[in-house]
């Protein structure tokens, strides 16, 4: 990529138009890793110049989503910095952009356009009807003198400010993700984009570029959907006479089937949804780092420190990444298994509290019990949000949806009732109530009853948990305790007796 001169400064500049897309988190992450790798600064800036699409509260949501993943900024809207404010609407109110608009008008690189939306639509329709494949608007006012433009504006007629694009030659830039490849656009294929709306609000193309210059941004890492807009940005840098930042356009993330990009409209890709479902920040951080970047082609599990050390743009692939929810789920499971018991207990506590199983925060007794239960699901858990369903029967009484679930293979209602009665009788006097004693007594009971372990253990499992699949049986019985175990065995026996009718002798 070449030697970087001076301190690296990058930015992530989302628009508060709703929840933060997971692809946006990936873009922020690549910026953050690049800055940290080079000992530079990562800046967060809110670009809210699109008043129609602005969603109140979404700026707070996107900051919370970034912080959840572990992305902190060195300058930003909530912590300030030397180039505050870091919200474009506030910068507009402060009059930051107006002098630069005047500079473009004075130099002839921009002009006031008085063409209305209705006129523009009519011109577009006529051009397309005439066989033009792509309508490229260049307003008649581009040839007016600035004095004439100002005279028209003085009459009160609404206007936008447009960039006066050249009609000949090419506009080019180099892209670091493509190995510094020179990307060219023929100027005749450009059009005069709007820089300032009729409301006076600057649009993204102008506002972000002025902000990048004033905030001394050295590298612009952004989605490759902005490649087509980059020639306009290059023309603006040239018009101002400013040094351009280095550009790196990141590959899109496709759906798992490869049919199109991940989309807010059709895919469950809100960053906060992964938070709510119980993905660990470290797992999401690791997985997103691999969405378009690879260290050596096979190493996948890497710590934040390793990713910072290894991340370089020459390892970012220009071809699209592909979203794989199963791989993310597996990676989350790996990170969950790396947690210590108390760490996992504390991580799942909010999910159990949300389900009404424990308090928020849990009492000391609740936390101690949760620490006891956590090893029972530690190896099985892939999302923290699965914990309430897996552990619910430890906190609430069991209601059998169908007593016939108690009956195991090659058993009937009568033998199942008898087995439950025998288990209750065998366990009632048992002391101490430990894993080894429970296993020894119940295995001995299997032999006495002529049952296979799976038959007796399966019936007991359903009786005490209400489900056919549950954590290891003897650990479960220890965690439930003697009194609850015996009570549930008796309740299950009674339920099956009632359900099966008079043919079952108690």
Curated annotation (Swiss-Prot):
<dbReference type="GO" id="GO:0006424">
    <property type="term" value="P:glutamyl-tRNA aminoacylation"/>
</dbReference>
<dbReference type="InterPro" id="IPR049940">
    <property type="entry name" value="GluQ/Sye"/>
</dbReference>
<dbReference type="GO" id="GO:0004818">
    <property type="term" value="F:glutamate-tRNA ligase activity"/>
</dbReference>
<feature type="short sequence motif" description="'HIGH' region">
    <location>
        <begin position="14"/>
        <end position="24"/>
    </location>
</feature>
<keyword id="KW-0547">Nucleotide-binding</keyword>
<feature type="binding site">
    <location>
        <position position="264"/>
    </location>
    <ligand>
        <name>ATP</name>
    </ligand>
</feature>
<dbReference type="Pfam" id="PF19269">
    <property type="entry name" value="Anticodon_2"/>
</dbReference>
<comment type="subunit">
    <text>Monomer.</text>
</comment>
<dbReference type="GO" id="GO:0000049">
    <property type="term" value="F:tRNA binding"/>
</dbReference>
<dbReference type="GO" id="GO:0005829">
    <property type="term" value="C:cytosol"/>
</dbReference>
<keyword id="KW-0963">Cytoplasm</keyword>
<keyword id="KW-0030">Aminoacyl-tRNA synthetase</keyword>
<comment type="function">
    <text>Catalyzes the attachment of glutamate to tRNA(Glu) in a two-step reaction: glutamate is first activated by ATP to form Glu-AMP and then transferred to the acceptor end of tRNA(Glu).</text>
</comment>
<dbReference type="InterPro" id="IPR014729">
    <property type="entry name" value="Rossmann-like_a/b/a_fold"/>
</dbReference>
<dbReference type="InterPro" id="IPR045462">
    <property type="entry name" value="aa-tRNA-synth_I_cd-bd"/>
</dbReference>
<dbReference type="InterPro" id="IPR020752">
    <property type="entry name" value="Glu-tRNA-synth_I_codon-bd_sub1"/>
</dbReference>
<dbReference type="GO" id="GO:0008270">
    <property type="term" value="F:zinc ion binding"/>
</dbReference>
<comment type="similarity">
    <text>Belongs to the class-I aminoacyl-tRNA synthetase family. Glutamate--tRNA ligase type 1 subfamily.</text>
</comment>
<keyword id="KW-0436">Ligase</keyword>
<dbReference type="InterPro" id="IPR001412">
    <property type="entry name" value="aa-tRNA-synth_I_CS"/>
</dbReference>
<dbReference type="InterPro" id="IPR033910">
    <property type="entry name" value="GluRS_core"/>
</dbReference>
<feature type="short sequence motif" description="'KMSKS' region">
    <location>
        <begin position="261"/>
        <end position="265"/>
    </location>
</feature>
<dbReference type="InterPro" id="IPR020751">
    <property type="entry name" value="aa-tRNA-synth_I_codon-bd_sub2"/>
</dbReference>
<protein>
    <recommendedName>
        <fullName>Glutamate--tRNA ligase</fullName>
        <ecNumber>6.1.1.17</ecNumber>
    </recommendedName>
</protein>
<keyword id="KW-0648">Protein biosynthesis</keyword>
<dbReference type="InterPro" id="IPR000924">
    <property type="entry name" value="Glu/Gln-tRNA-synth"/>
</dbReference>
<dbReference type="GO" id="GO:0005524">
    <property type="term" value="F:ATP binding"/>
</dbReference>
<dbReference type="InterPro" id="IPR020058">
    <property type="entry name" value="Glu/Gln-tRNA-synth_Ib_cat-dom"/>
</dbReference>
<dbReference type="InterPro" id="IPR008925">
    <property type="entry name" value="aa_tRNA-synth_I_cd-bd_sf"/>
</dbReference>
<dbReference type="Pfam" id="PF00749">
    <property type="entry name" value="tRNA-synt_1c"/>
</dbReference>
<dbReference type="InterPro" id="IPR004527">
    <property type="entry name" value="Glu-tRNA-ligase_bac/mito"/>
</dbReference>
<keyword id="KW-0067">ATP-binding</keyword>
């Amino acid at each position: 990529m070449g030697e970087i001169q001076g301190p690296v400064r990058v930015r992530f500049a989302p628009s508060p138009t709703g929840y933060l897309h997971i692809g946006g988190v990936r873009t922020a992450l690549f910026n953050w890793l690049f800055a940290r790798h080079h000992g530079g600064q990562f800046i967060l800036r809110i670009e809210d110049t699109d008043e129609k699409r602005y969603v109140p509260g979404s700026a707070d949501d996107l900051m919370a989503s970034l912080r959840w993943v572990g992305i902190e900024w060195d300058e930003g809207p909530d912590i300030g910095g030397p180039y505050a404010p870091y919200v474009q609407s506030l910068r507009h109110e402060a009059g930051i952009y107006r002098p630069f608009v005047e500079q473009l008008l004075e130099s002839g690189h921009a002009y006031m356009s008085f063409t209305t939306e209705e006129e523009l639509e009519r011109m577009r329709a006529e051009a397309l009807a005439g066989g033009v494949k792509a309508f490229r608007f260049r307003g008649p006012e581009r040839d007016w003198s600035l004095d004439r433009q100002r005279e028209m504006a003085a009459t009160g007629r609404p206007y936008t400010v447009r960039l006066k694009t050249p009609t000949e030659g090419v506009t080019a830039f180099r892209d670091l993700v493509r190995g510094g490849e020179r990307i060219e656009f023929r100027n005749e294929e450009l059009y005069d984009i709007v820089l300032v709306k009729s409301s006076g609000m600057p649009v993204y193309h102008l506002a972000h570029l002025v902000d990048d210059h004033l905030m001394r941004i050295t590298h612009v890492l952004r989605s490759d959907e902005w490649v087509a807009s980059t020639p306009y940005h290059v023309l603006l840098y040239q018009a101002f006479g400013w040094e351009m930042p280095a550009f790196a356009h990141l590959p899109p993330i496709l759906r798992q089937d490869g049919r199109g990009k991940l989309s807010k409209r059709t895919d469950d890709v809100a960053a906060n949804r992964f938070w709510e479902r119980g993905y660990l920040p470290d797992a999401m951080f690791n997985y997103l780092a691999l969405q378009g970047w690879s260290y050596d082609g096979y190493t996948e599990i890497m710590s934040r420190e390793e990713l910072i050390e290894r991340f370089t743009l020459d390892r970012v692939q220009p071809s699209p990444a592909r979203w794989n929810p199963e791989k993310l789920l597996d990676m989350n499971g790996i990170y969950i298994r790396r947690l210590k018991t108390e760490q996992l207990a504390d991580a799942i506590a909010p999910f159990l509290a949300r389900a009404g199983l424990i308090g928020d925060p849990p009492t000391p007794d609740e936390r101690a019990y949760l620490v006891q239960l956590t090893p029972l699901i530690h190896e099985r858990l892939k999302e923290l949000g699965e914990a309430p369903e897996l552990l619910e029967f430890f906190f609430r009484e069991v209601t059998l949806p169908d007593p016939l679930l108690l009956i195991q293979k090659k058993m009937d209602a009568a033998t199942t009732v008898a087995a439950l009665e025998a288990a209750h009788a065998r366990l009632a006097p048992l002391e101490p109530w430990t894993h080894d004693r429970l296993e020894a007594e119940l295995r001995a009971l299997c032999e006495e009853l002529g049952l296979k372990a799976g038959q007796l253990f399966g019936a007991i499992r359903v009786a005490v948990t209400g489900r056919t699949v549950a954590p290891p049986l003897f650990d479960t019985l220890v965690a439930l305790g003697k009194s609850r175990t015996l009570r549930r065995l008796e309740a299950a026996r009674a339920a099956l007796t009632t359900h099966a009718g008079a043919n079952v002798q108690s």
